[in-house]
From Swiss-Prot, chains A, B:
Keyword tags: Aminoacyl-tRNA synthetase, ATP-binding, Cytoplasm, Ligase, Nucleotide-binding, Protein biosynthesis
Record-given protein name: Asparagine--tRNA ligase
Keyword Cytoplasm: yes
Annotated gene: asnS
Name of the top EC class for this enzyme: ligase
GO MF, one example: asparagine-tRNA ligase activity
Cellular compartment(s): Cytoplasm
Reactions mediated catalytically: tRNA(Asn) + L-asparagine + ATP = L-asparaginyl-tRNA(Asn) + AMP + diphosphate + H(+)
GO biological process, one term: asparaginyl-tRNA aminoacylation
One of the record's GO cellular component terms: cytoplasm
Family: Belongs to the class-II aminoacyl-tRNA synthetase family.
InterPro entries referenced in this protein's UniProt entry, alphabetically: Aa-tRNA-synt_II, aa-tRNA-synth_II, aa-tRNA-synth_II/BPL/LPL, Asn-tRNA-ligase, Asp/Asn-tRNA-synth_IIb, NA-bd_OB-fold, NA-bd_OB_tRNA
NCBIfam families found in the cross-reference section: asnS (TIGR00457), PRK03932.1 (NF003037), PRK05159.1 (NF003483)
SUPFAM superfamilies named among the record's database cross-references: Class II aaRS and biotin synthetases, Nucleic acid-binding proteins
Length: 429, 429
């Protein structure tokens, strides 16, 4: 048995090949049935001829509906009029399952398609999306492994919240309330004392009521923490990581990008260094293009969209006002009202994909910020301990993998970047 | 700046080196302070001499407690009496943080150590455990990527349970109840029609009240589904995968295994093929060694421990009685009271690490089993659809990554195999 991509090559022309898959298109005309078969590697046109099969066989194969499954044996030929330039002339076949009508056709509503996501995933678009996504996950991990990072794992059911309590999902843990984690960061920080450079790729959960095109209630979060490096060095790592992923996707999924309408060359042009712009300068840029933003305003989805439409490369926004960022980000010694942070905004209107910063490593500074934030010190005992015993300077970041995938593939909605999106209105299938 | 492993080499003997890390041991004697420093790569003994430093410097470095953090510059020498054969003679140093007393010392109770897991992880044993774990995760994924599998992602908040409802954690989803997923299997099955060969590595959640040494309420679950293959071929893939992981761990973590007291050569001997024993024969074996088991009894932790003490390789147990296994496993045509399944039991008393099977792909057969099991058909509409539209034969498995790690490292308790174990009695830190 060959994959369709393997079979569709010069080497097999004139030979008998066996392939299997699903009916992608079918039509009959003048005693010949043309069936386009798809598998995970591609499509190929096959022909069944009335005068070469028994009447029962010809009837069986001619009556297959879209997405019927079958295997077949036939002769591979060159055929310039077929969609791929190859064609298989069928001698024998076995039907695994005959469908009459496949539920997904053109012109169906969004809700119907979401209810039938398990079938919709078979489209060529989704197949390409899933392949690109797989490359993105693999290459993220490879980038860090190859630089001596270790992959680690942090808990999901937690009692301490990294980013505050309003967007936490509550779980009934044998009768006690507990929360689903929103970030691995604090736990990753505990592991730099053993391993120095760590990353994790895991789901995070946010009970956000947002219905924007870039929010999910569960999403894949890739996070890293690194001992001994500062905010600038962290940005150096990240821009190289993003470009490494882009290059791998172009190399391994060129045709998938094309099929999705994403120009691989536009991506290839997004080479580091990425611009690094202070928050205060981004506010100026925003006002120059007619937005009404003042210093101290946060950048939401809308603002980021308008701003990043101006950029053709990802852009780091640094030095946010302290009030807009969490307690663990250190103040900039040159301007204590700002913190040593960086958000990475994807260009072309996509907006935030990474949030990162240097982390406060001084015990007194951390305790002051915890008190200012009004947090319960006892819940953070283990996080505070890290600054009491052998604390070292360090930085880290969190990357929204689904957002990265959405931007790399230039998709319209984050729901298209993940097989089974979970939003405030959607938990099935 | 060099890592301790890089600095501790012939090439640097006689040269000035810079290293940094944490105090692992310290003692003073006759005007010399011996400090063993550790970083993520290893340890090295350093000496500070009273007559080569200022009195303030000598006092500062001599008074550092365990786990204090520092960087230092000094001359690398060979020193047969040091723990690694190398020694650095300190010229200059910078203390990042001085500790007086590190909370973790010898002879501390289990609960204290679990409460201070964030500090306990710095031990050399845990550092090695975390490194081996990282290799296991990387090599699992590499094995499948290299065979053309795609990594995919499935949802966590679900309304359909794979293995029944009694051990589900309930989440408050904006006021509605929803459950944490226990297995990606059904969702993986939906993706074989696009990609044919898929895997995922993700947390699974089980509200089991067991307090055995091999259960966690959240654990890392690696699952795969593969179109067109049967139960036997699935076992072939799995035994090769297990052996690939073992080989990578031996190659990349030989010293870690030694430090943990696991003999790498005992692991290396566990070459495929692994024995494949029918459930009915395992019951006979159990009774021969004095256990009181009858056909139809399930194998729990205790039974698997006793049975696998007899094996020095992993063993597949196939052909379970239908009643002991879930509805989606097909009956063996040669014996319809048994199913085409396989559990992989790790030897040396460890027991089940994989559960897998062929999956029912015939629509009528599936519907009959769903009805026999008394399940709500409407909740499974999307799973049933897979047998209505282009169904194909397929098989899959789920592997408990923490259990695999526990067995590979020969650990006593699964809690030692994961940084932050979650059990019925433990949700912090
Ligand atoms: Mg933002
Ligand atoms: Mg069992």
């Amino acid at each position: 048995m060959l994959s369709i991509a393997e079979a569709s090559s010069e080497a097999h022309v004139g030979s008998e090949v066996s392939v299997r898959g699903w009916v992608y298109r079918i039509r009959s005309s003048g005693g010949v049935t043309f069936i386009v078969i798809r598998d995970s590697t591609g499509i190929v046109q096959c022909t069944a001829k009335k005068n070469e099969l028994t009447p029962e066989q010809y009837d069986e194969i001619s009556s297959l509906g879209i997405e019927s499954s079958l295997s077949l044996i036939g002769t591979m030929k060159k055929e310039p009029r077929s969609p791929t330039g190859y064609e298989i002339s069928i001698h024998k076949f076995t039907v695994y399952q005959k469908n009459d009508v496949f539920p997904i056709t053109k012109d169906q509503g969004e809700e119907f398609l979401l209810d039938n996501r398990h079938l919709w995933l078979r489209s060529r678009e989704f197949t390409s999306i899933l392949k690109v996504r797989s490359t993105i996950f693999r290459s993220f991990a490879d980038f860090f492994y190859d630089q001596g990072y270790y992959q680690v794992h942090t808990p999901f059911m937690v009692s301490t919240a990294v980013e505050g309590g309003s967007t936490l999902f509550k779980v009934d843990f044998f009768g006690e309330p507990i929360f689903l984690n929103q970030s691995a960061q604090f736990y990753l920080e505990t592991m730099i004392y053993s391993l120095e450079k760590v990353f994790t790729i895991a789901p995070s959960f946010r009970a956000e009521k947002s219905r924007t095109r870039r929010h999910l209630t569960e999403y894949w979060h890739a996070e890293a923490e690194v001992a001994w490096i500062d905010n600038r060095e962290m940005m150096d790592v990240e821009e190289n990581m993003i470009y490494y992923i882009i290059q791998r996707v172009i190399e391994e999924n060129y045709d998938d990008l094309k099929l999705l309408g994403r120009d691989p060359e536009a991506l290839r042009a997004m080479k580091p260094p990425f611009p690094r712009v202070k928050y205060s300068d981004i506010i100026k840029v925003a006002n120059e293009i007619g937005m009404q933003l003042k210093y101290g305003d946060d950048l939401g989805a809308d603002e980021e969209r308008q701003i990043t439409m101006r950029y053709c490369k990802p852009v780091f926004v640094t030095n946010y006002p302290k009030e807009l960022k969490p307690f663990y980000m250190p103040q900039d010694p040159d301007n204590p009202s700002e913190v040593l942070n960086h958000d990475l905004l994807a260009p072309e209107g996509y907006g935030e994909i990474i949030g990162g910063s240097q982390r406060i490593w001084d015990y007194k500074e951390l305790m002051q910020r915890i008190r200012e934030a009004g947090l319960d010190e006892s819940a953070y005992y283990w996080y505070i301990d890290l600054r009491k015993y052998g604390s070292v300077p360090h930085s880290g970041f969190g990357l929204g993998m689904d957002r990265l995938a959405m931007w790399i593939m230039h998709l319209d909605n984050i729901r298209e970047a993940i097989p089974y999106p979970r939003t405030i209105r959607r938990t099935k299938p």
